[in-house]
Amino acid sequence: MSLHRDSMVPVNSRLENMDSPILSKICAWGVMLGLFALSLFAMAYACYHKQTSNSCIEEKQGKKQVLKPLDMEPKIVVIMAGNENPTFFAKPTQINA
């Protein structure tokens, strides 16, 4: 700490107040923005990498893929509980009312 030539007020020439809440908030914001930028970069790279690999695969195959029909039956299993073990499996049926 030194005194300014024209005044009697001490002047800090170095950072002595490193435990300031403002400094820690600025550092926290910097870390958060850095992580945000890193995640955006990773997502952009993954998207670009996926698009280029899909175009390479399509060029190598040279034909269109045929879509298989979807199974329209619901995949539901009902387990009827017994005393010690499940007694049987039930398959749901459609009721026409």
Swiss-Prot record:
Keyword Membrane in record: yes
Methyltransferase as UniProt keyword: no
Intervals, Extracellular compartment: 1-25
Protein's membrane topology: Single-pass membrane protein
Compartments, as annotated in UniProt: Membrane
Transmembrane segments: 26-46
Role this protein plays: Probable subunit of an amino acid transporter involved in the regulation of the amino acid metabolism. Stimulates amino acid export by activating nonselective amino acid facilitators.
Note, other: Overexpression of GLUTAMINE DUMPER 7 leads to free amino acid levels accumulation.
Name under which the protein is recorded: Protein GLUTAMINE DUMPER 7
